[in-house]
Amino acid sequence: MSETGRAEVTEDQVRSILRVRRGRSRIFGEGLFSDPAWDILLELLAARLANRKITLSELSEVAPKSVLARWIATLEEKGLVTCELNRFRTDDFRVALSDDCADRMIAFLSSARHLAG
């Protein structure tokens, strides 16, 4: 925990989790672990920790854009992400974790790290 009582999770730690998950897909095949929701949330957390805004197009490594759009809509309905239209590209928008989701993910990843350690 930090001095403020908040769990510490770094962008590098989140990126490491993403690399492991992608390696798992390479070994076991793409279709076996096909639900992209967790990977979307991890990508958005990594972007937030790096103080970057990310667009739907930038998430295309996670899943095809049509699949991403459906999942982003579901995550937005659940209050886990927020969306902001891109005024320069009407076919793209910025996506970010809600503050509550970011806090919950950091708490989860911090507790998971302590369980593994």
Language model features with spans:
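Intrinsically disordered or compositionally simple regulatory linkers and C-terminal tails
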Residues: 1-4
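Short acidic, hydrophobic short linear motifs in intrinsically disordered regions
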Residues: 50-62
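Short amphipathic alpha-helical elements of helix-turn-helix/winged-helix folds
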Residues: 43-47
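A short, conserved structural fragment
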Residues: 76-87
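Short, amphipathic alpha-helical interaction segments positioned at domain boundaries
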Residues: 99-117
